[in-house]
Regions:
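Periplasm-facing N-terminal accessory domains of Gram-negative outer-membrane beta-barrel systems
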Residues: 15-108
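Membrane-embedded beta-strand positions in outer-membrane beta-barrel channels/transporters
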Residues: 57, 94-96, 164, 210, ...
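Periplasmic N-terminal accessory/gating domains of Gram-negative outer-membrane beta-barrel systems
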Residues: 78, 86-91, 112-219, 229-231, ...
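Extracytoplasmic loops and strand-loop junctions of Gram-negative outer membrane beta-barrel proteins
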Residues: 130, 192-197, 213-214, 238-240, ...
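Short strand-turn segments of transmembrane beta-barrel domains in outer membranes
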Residues: 197-201, 209-220, 225-259, 278-280, ...
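Transmembrane beta-strands of outer-membrane beta-barrel pores
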Residues: 215-217, 234-236, 248-252, 261, ...
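Transmembrane beta-barrel wall of Gram-negative outer-membrane proteins
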Residues: 249-282, 291-325, 347-369
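Face-selective signature of the C-terminal outer-membrane beta-barrel domain
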Residues: 306-324, 346-458
């Protein structure tokens, strides 16, 4: 009885503790990525407001957990509003905001912000949206591809539950994808080789700062896209403390961690930060309980490490990978339709990984940025069918494909008054191999081909 009384006394305090949280972030210059000291950050509809420190950081503490709009303003820069920032009691991601410089002086006018942002180079074909918009998008389920499919000019896949992106009537394999300036060949689980489409998204939304979709008139720095470009910009990890969150969904569970590395002083921001996440599905266990013959099983992992060498130089090491397996099991109850599905379904083993290292150098005059990156991506895909798919014995058909690409990119961006110039070069070394075996037709061949490609653009 005594324990119950104590619990009832302190229970309201426990509830209150779960209804408050903290929100931190960083404000940077859009051109040279320099921190903006003294920028004002206000939570709309409240009395909460802070000013950024010398490193551009701000912190709100003991804020009620709900959805807020943040307004960021700084003298000489355009005021920016971030909508629907969801504050949680634990694990709220760090916000990173880039402000655009404004050199024009105007009379007082009323501006209404469009929900989609565009650029001067491609004002009609480029759309930019933030991670907050992805998380709060109805029906998006924290899947970036599903949100992109609802954009103007984009058509979803018409063949099954797939995340294919079809731009203006093109093909799913005609778009390219970039993660912090590094090309990634795949953004979905169980992807079709040569196309990034698949049933489940691969990228962790909590890593993303913003996503830019170019459905036409894309910049020259992108390597020969036919239909469009989808560029993902990731945020930096928390430089002051360790943070993270655990997600438990209907089909999967995942954990995300972020924080400083090699931090020496308690009150100072670390020069090295990290972001890391891993996710595991448990669909195979659910399907086993439902007595279904299919067993999809997937893992994915993602990381990003930022290291600031000095005021003008920084290094970024990032990566993304997946482990996908699709197998079959014998159900307790058989009927002709289940038997036909088991005989026709393939056994899939797919492994993907992309890793890249980037060096970013800011010009000392503050009017540009040079980026040098080296990346590699590998894909292994084994597609098999057996006379007995349950025991995986007596192979009938097998296709073992392997891709390995290494890329080097150099990009220099300079700003002159209202002009922007982009100059760069790229180099790519690719190896593709294929081993196909078909017992029914007596086919068994092994092929391998290599390519070297380089280019210049301005």
């Amino acid at each position: 009885m005594k324990k119950r009384i104590i619990f009832l006394i302190f229970f309201p305090f426990f509830i209150y503790a779960q209804n408050i949280g903290s929100l931190d972030g960083r404000i940077l210059d859009d051109q040279d990525q320099q921190p903006l000291e003294g920028a004002t950050v206000i939570i709309e509809g409240t009395s909460f407001g802070v000013v950024t420190d010398e490193n551009g950081y701000f912190v709100f503490e003991n804020i009620p957990t709900k959805s807020y709009n943040l307004t960021i303003s700084f003298l000489g820069y355009r005021t920016k509003t971030i909508y629907n920032v969801i504050l949680k009691s634990f694990g709220t991601p760090t916000i990173q905001v880039l402000l655009e410089e404004s050199s024009d002086e105007l009379e007082e006018i009323i501006l209404v912000q469009s929900p989609f942002r565009t650029t001067r180079e491609t004002p009609l074909s480029t759309q930019t949206f933030s991670a907050v918009e992805i998380e709060t998008y109805p029906g998006g389920n924290n899947d970036i591809t599903k949100v992109v499919q609802s954009m103007p000019g984009i058509s979803p896949s018409i063949g099954g539950f797939r995340n294919d992106i079809i731009i203006r009537g093109g093909a799913p394999n005609e778009s390219v994808y970039y993660l912090d300036g590094i090309e990634i060949p795949n953004i979905n689980h169980f992807s079709t080789q040569g196309s990034a489409g698949g049933p489940l998204g691969l990228l962790n939304v909590s890593f993303i700062r913003e996503v830019t979709l170019s459905s036409s008139a894309f910049g020259a720095e992108y390597d020969n896209p036919l239909s469009g470009v989808l560029s993902f910009e990731q945020r930096e990890g928390n430089s002051k403390r360790l943070a993270g969150n655990f997600r438990f969904g209907a089909t999967e569970a995942g954990i995300t961690l972020e924080g400083p590395l090699f931090k020496k002083k308690e009150n100072k921001s670390a020069k090295t930060t990290f972001l890391f996440s891993v996710r595991r599905s448990y669909l195979q266990f659910l399907f086993e309980l439902l007595d279904l013959p299919i067993r999809p099983d997937y893992w994915d992992y993602q990381w990003k490490i930022n290291h600031k060498i000095n005021k003008y130089n920084s290094l970024i090491f990032l990566g993304l990978g997946s482990i996908d397996d699709f197998s079959l099991r014998s159900p307790k109850v058989f009927d002709p339709s289940i038997q036909a599905s088991i005989e026709q379904a393939p056994i899939i083993k797919q492994r993907t990984i992309t890793a890249g290292l980037s060096w970013k150098k800011k010009y000392k005059d503050g009017n540009g940025l040079m980026t040098t990156s080296v990346s590699t991506n590998r894909l292994g895909n084994i597609f098999s069918r057996f006379r007995d798919n349950i025991s995986q014995s007596n192979v009938v058909f097998e296709n073992d494909s392997y891709e390995w690409e290494t890329k080097i990119r150099l990009k220099s961006v300079r700003y002159f008054d209202n002009w922007k110039t982009v100059i760069g070069t790229n180099f790519q070394n690719s190896t593709y191999s294929n081993n196909t075996k078909n017992v029914l037709y007596g086919l068994n061949y092994n092929t391998k081909i290599k390519f070297l490609k380089f280019g210049l653009y301005a």
